[in-house]
Amino acid sequence: MKYLSNKSTSIYKNGETCTTTQYDFDNKNVGFAISKINGRYPEEGYFVNEGVQELIYVLEGSGSLHKKTESVSFKKGDAVLIEKGEECYWLGNCKVVTICCPAWYESQHKMIK
């Protein structure tokens, strides 16, 4: 078992509309974070995770997740699975839990204009 308090986290400002609190369990198989999204993220274009899947659980608020060919709306209590390789963007005002498998790492996260 590994325990982390909320005092041993890293906070990342991903532009003007997204702030992420990362819990670093030092485990390459799974990652955990909480993000606050206020508006569109990314502000232009799309993001893609080339190496991880993201399971999203909505803690607060609502919004939508958009791909080039489809979109899905969500609200508190909903869950969304973003497969690796999916190009998408967020639109909303929400707080979400993100569980990544394997653990999220920066070099696989790309922005697409």
What is the meaning of each model-derived region?
Residues 2-3, 29-31, 91-113:
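Double-stranded beta-helix
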Residues 68-85:
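Short acidic-glycine-tyrosine-enriched beta hairpin
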Residues 88:
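Glycine-rich nucleotide phosphate-binding loop and flanking beta-alpha elements
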Residues 5-6, 33-35, 73-77:
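Short amphipathic beta-strand/extended segments with alternating polar/hydrophobic composition
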Residues 26, 66-70, 93:
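Short strand-coil-strand connectors
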Residues 48-65:
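Short, conserved beta-strand element in jelly-roll/cupin
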Residues 9-47:
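A short glycine-rich, His/Asp/Glu-containing loop-to-beta-strand
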